[in-house]
Amino acid sequence: MIMLRIPTRSYCSPSKLIKGVGLSPLKKSLLSKKIKEDIHPSLPVRTRFAPSPTGFLHLGSLRTALYNYLLARNTNGQFLLRLEDTDQKRLIEGAEENIYEILKWCNINYDETPIKQSERKLIYDKYVKILLSSGKAYRCFCSKERLNDLRHSAMELKPPSMASYDRCCAHLGEEEIKSKLAQGIPFTVRFKSPERYPTFTDLLHGQINLQPQVNFNDKRYDDLILVKSDKLPTYHLANVVDDHLMGITHVIRGEEWLPSTPKHIALYNAFGWACPKFIHIPLLTTVGDKKLSKRKGDMSISDLKRQGVLPEALINFCALFGWSPPRDLASKKHECFSMEELETIFNLNGLTKGNAKVDDKKLWFFNKHFLQKRILNPSTLRELVDDIMPSLESIYNTSTISREKVAKILLNCGGSLSRINDFHDEFYYFFEKPKYNDNDAVTKFLSKNESRHIAHLLKKLGQFQEGTDAQEVESMVETMYYENGFSRKVTYQAMRFALAGCHPGAKIAAMIDILGIKESNKRLSEGLQFLQREKK
């Protein structure tokens, strides 16, 4: 076990705990003690997801919710939801509703009625009184100006002290306190922190000992505030009280919360409560190993949803941010897992310590996989058609579109789609006549030395009989290019250009089957006319 003093004004991010060494990446972390034993619980657990509605859900928050959910489901335990909304000034309109909406959309279902911390002030007051009466907390009447001076002077010390308070108010007598209360002087409630914060065990990282840097010639104290001057609890107090009262056994949260953990454990000890097990999961980073942010790839889940990301793809994507499935299953399933499969195979022993790199190429790989599964399922295929129809109806005459046609396109050609939002861009030619204005396709079409043969080919092929099926079309096309000595590539490129006006496109047989014989013959004829005009 290694003890580190934390050289920041408040607890810094784990990646900056000491110069050149941090918790991230943790492959060779100084704070790690390899745990060989099985860390996965054998009994049912109670976990929670505790977001603050100060913004909309992002990838990091969704991963935290998912891991807590999967651990609960895997052990036949319970997964709870708590809204940490005590910081009223930072609340964002619509953020609370967004949390409910995204969890439901992702099929992350909580087991009990959600708890809102803003509705539990009386509960927190009760436990603050317990700490005050036992001398483990005290009222602080210091002004903002005095506190700012203390922080400034602490930083001027050599070495500087990251703990800044001098416990002036901890020594006030009862009469002084009563007098200040009677005068209506604003106050906070501070926790009387221990001389040293307790060492704790993180199930992923092992034993950790984090202490604030202090100057022993000018003693200051890291007495965190439990109740703000507006009488609302701080995150630290509400977090500990709620986790205890909710019976939470395991807390999975981001690595950035590691520096807060000694404070929380000290509070548990002050109340005489048992602590939950802690698991701090690695940071999400870009492919270049930069911390993910709104400017660097951490889009809200709502944005991803609008872009056409499917919930099952997003869940699969997030599950692999810091967790590895059993090797035998990963090789068989190519890392594609349904929620039901994840609930079965999720295990804390699969958690990894290194930063999790977010590569959106992987997301679209998963999205394509799950989109194909939806297309092949009659029930979800109907839902996809429902999603597509409104946009088509806003563009085209109803005579050119139908639910049956859209379903047929998806079944025959949807294998090329990575997201349903691309349906129109990929398959517009099924709903409108070719414009023959795709420069790349036109160049390829007209630059062929076989233009005379192509003209002959289109003329012959533009005579399909009604009732000809896809297999017969394939056979006729093959016969045509074999008998006339054309190359297969040139034949199909010419037909695709005439039918769709683009290159590449769907398979020829599928295009003719969807367009119908009459429309296909018409387009082949128009393609021939275009060729003849352009070659004059």
From Swiss-Prot:
Tell me a GO cellular component.
mitochondrion
* Catalysed reactions, as listed in the record: tRNA(Glu) + L-glutamate + ATP = L-glutamyl-tRNA(Glu) + AMP + diphosphate
Short motif 'HIGH' region, span: 53-61
- Which EC number(s) are documented for this chain? 6.1.1.17
- Kindly indicate whether the keyword Metal-binding belongs to this entry: no
User: What GO biological process terms are annotated to this protein in UniProt?
Assistant: glutamyl-tRNA aminoacylation; mitochondrial glutamyl-tRNA aminoacylation; mitochondrial translation
Enzyme category, top tier: ligase
User: Where is this protein found?
Assistant: Mitochondrion matrix
Q: Where does ATP bind?
A: H58, E256, K291, L292, S293, K294, R295
Kindly list the positions annotated as binding L-glutamate: R48, F49, A50, E84, Y235, H236, L237, A238, N239, R253
Superkingdom, natural source: Eukaryota
Misc remark: Present with 2940 molecules/cell in log phase SD medium.
State the family it belongs to. Belongs to the class-I aminoacyl-tRNA synthetase family. Glutamate--tRNA ligase type 1 subfamily.
Report the function annotation for this chain: Catalyzes the attachment of glutamate to tRNA(Glu) in a two-step reaction: glutamate is first activated by ATP to form Glu-AMP and then transferred to the acceptor end of tRNA(Glu).
Q: What is this protein called?
A: Glutamate--tRNA ligase, mitochondrial
